[in-house]
Amino acid sequence: MSILSMVEDRPTPKEVYNWRIYLLAAVASFTSCMIGYDSAFIGTTISLDSFKNEFHWDSMSTAKQNLVSANIVSCYQAGAFFGAFFAYPIGHFWGRKWGLMLSALVFTLGAGLMLGANGDRGLGLIYGGRVLAGLGVGAGSNFTPIYISELAPPAIRGRLVGVYELGWQVGGLVGFWINYGVEQTMAPSHKQWLIPFAVQLIPAGLLIIGILFVKESPRWLFLRGRREEAIKNLCWIRQIPADHIYMIEEIGAIDQTLEHQRSTIGLGFWRPLKEAWTNKRILYRLFLGSMLFFWQNGSGINAINYYSPTVFKSIGLKGNSSSLLTTGIFGVVKTVVTIVWLLYLIDHVGRRLLLLIGAAGGSICMWIVGAYIKVVDPTHNQSDHLNGGGVAAIFFFYLWTAFYTPSWNGTPWVINSEMFDPNIRSLAQACAAGSNWLWNFLISRFTPQMFAKMDYGVYFFFASLMLLSIPFVFFLVPETKGIPLENMDPLFQTQPVWRAHAKVLAQIHEDEARFRRDLEESGYTKGNVEQVEDTDRKE
């Protein structure tokens, strides 16, 4: 089987790959549009002259400016960290659908608070609004990947969870370009910097409206004992009847997994909490999930997202307009590469190989950019234009983006959404999202100080971390593409890690063939299907 083949766990009717699952994933992913926009717009908005003038930037020392910038950016991540954990009880008792609604409402309240800020009132409303917005997106970053992964057929689960990442990049693209637009078309004023803050309300409003029409996760309904509603929702999503052999297999697998969990860990609210800290198998996967986000943030991506003007200034770009334009192009590159990742790479190349290639290529690019800054010291360039070396540095920066985006940007979210048992999934995703926001907070809080003290060493620091992630992934992270959620336990128990995927998939195919043979011998004929994808054929 080629690494470029899409892997099905069993013959799948064409009706399963329908527009409904893509629509549900797209609606839920307005959450990530909120996250992406907030991550992108804030760094360039606070660099606008109109913002600096209104909040008396010139009266602050350089150290104070760095501190205030870091606080404005990082209080959002602090809120998101706690929001990710608050999402666990909400997701357990209220479900994924209404959890997403609540996260959008809290975010909207935070965005509204920020709009009340001005020079007379000071930055307090921005700080408070950023914390509330962070609470909302932190909870949303828990609910959305789980919701999508629980709806998705295994063969396209990576693609569907990848819609969450695409939403992040689309929001980021708007966030990067909006400040270039207001800087070019509006005179410095209160409105100029307020408009980027107001645009936050658009994806939040779309999510609130969309959530009213989506279906609750069938797997959550099964977990809560609402069986009839769960089967009804699953049939609607799959577009096949409950007595179809595919549905019989899927419902049977869910029932079997829940029964196993009921007899071991338990299905309540408190038992998973206890199990998470005492069960070595679960602790190990929590460690893997948290470390994936450590390596992701250690690549330097959020230093660039939040402080892109500082990053491009270190390479030698002069002028706010040039910095905003270059940042906008950075957003375009990320979005285009994310679309390729979503449509093809994540479910064909798989998670593991993408992480390895991205870490190796991205590390090389960071070493080159850091070495250029060390040798040339472009910040002392008296010319208004980049020289040849500066252009080359910008090229390697964008090449780093092309390596990083289809690997470490969204793949850790995909893996974390699929590698846990159903009764522990909400708690595990809370821990995963919380760890992302913790590392995110640390990077965003100290990036200005790192650039002030380390200069080119910042790039060497990020390059080293990307290099260290390679043995971690190779020896510890198995491939998960095409593996049903109910089969993650044997996948993570199979050794060696680099052969686990092939071994487990072979066992799944063997079990599925035996199940269908037994059904045929019993006289069951309804719902025979042909496999949609030939998994031994190159796409």
Swiss-Prot record:
Biological process annotations from GO: quinate metabolic process
Extracellular side: 44-74, 119-130, 181-193, 307-325, 374-387, 478-539
Keyword Membrane (UniProt): yes
PROSITE patterns: MFS, SUGAR_TRANSPORT_1, SUGAR_TRANSPORT_2
InterPro entries from the UniProt entry: MFS_dom (IPR020846), MFS_sugar_transport-like (IPR005828), MFS_Sugar_Transporters (IPR050360), MFS_trans_sf (IPR036259), Sugar/inositol_transpt (IPR003663), Sugar_transporter_CS (IPR005829)
Signal peptide span: none
Presence of keyword Hydrolase: no
Function: Integral membrane transporter that imports quinic acid to be catabolized as a carbon source.
Family membership: Belongs to the major facilitator superfamily. Sugar transporter (TC 2.A.1.1) family.
Protein name (database record): Probable quinate permease
Species of origin: Aspergillus niger (strain ATCC MYA-4892 / CBS 513.88 / FGSC A1513)
